[in-house]
Amino acid sequence: MSSPRHVFYISDRTGLTAENIGEALLNQFGNLSFKRHTHPFVDTPEKARAVVEKVNRSRQENGQRPIAFVSVVDDEIRRIIKGADAFQINFFETFLGLLEKELNTEATASEQGHHSIGNTKRYDARMEAVNFSLNHDDGVSDKNLQEADVILMGVSRSGKTPTCLYLALQYGIRAANYPLIPDDLESADLPRMVKPYRDKLFGLTIQPERLQAIRQERRPNSTYAKIDTCRSEVADAQSMFRRHGIPFANTTDKSVEELAVHILQACKLKRRF
């Protein structure tokens, strides 16, 4: 079996753009393996040269030309990175020229956009949403719950918390979540805490076998992790969702990104920034 191809994500900011687009492309080659290296905040010539050295060293040690996904605005830094011995996909160079042609004007590179009032507002909206989600995780508090954009419900370990945090971070959505415990599942009514907010509820379900595997890692050989317990809880939760007309999604084969988009569409929610 051949050694994994080395992949570098190089950015003058967080690296999330390079990672997201790069991963979407690499996922089309499921038969190959990759070793990933992320280098964020490459925003000076010195940092760029250091990254180039790492890329070239990887080429020498691995014997294969690395792949580099580059998201860098500054021309000088991009020029330095171009000197790396790698197959490079530079998002700004690839798409900026096409946009300039379509808009019939040249781009004016500026760092100002990174620190504009608009970005400050986006940051504030994101942090407010994250704090809200953390303060309303796992049903710990019903204070200001009426301010939630959506309230996720599901049995323990069905993916509620990561989905809430992703909605908050990526979309500024105030997402709370409530764990369905056995007492809730035995009742024909909705849990008292979330009952007033019926229109904001969205359910998460999961295949019992997958749920058992997750719970087994947390509490090995416990009643909590038994397959019969998982099957019963999942079935009861789905019955509750159907009985009260609560939309729900299966988290088993969905990424958190897919789940978030599905929830936004189903609940008719819009990004806050």
From Swiss-Prot:
ADP binds at residues 154-161. InterPro entries: Kinase-pyrophosphorylase, PSRP. Its EC number is 2.7.11.33, 2.7.4.28. It catalyses: [pyruvate, water dikinase] + ADP = [pyruvate, water dikinase]-phosphate + AMP + H(+); [pyruvate, water dikinase]-phosphate + phosphate + H(+) = [pyruvate, water dikinase] + diphosphate. GO terms for molecular function: ADP binding; ATP binding; phosphotransferase activity, phosphate group as acceptor; protein serine/threonine kinase activity. It is an enzyme of class 2 (transferase). It comes from the Bacteria. The keyword Kinase applies. It holds the Pfam family Kinase-PPPase. Keywords: Kinase, Nucleotide-binding, Serine/threonine-protein kinase, Transferase. Belongs to the pyruvate, phosphate/water dikinase regulatory protein family. PSRP subfamily. Bifunctional serine/threonine kinase and phosphorylase involved in the regulation of the phosphoenolpyruvate synthase (PEPS) by catalyzing its phosphorylation/dephosphorylation. This is Putative phosphoenolpyruvate synthase regulatory protein. It comes from Neisseria meningitidis serogroup C / serotype 2a (strain ATCC 700532 / DSM 15464 / FAM18).
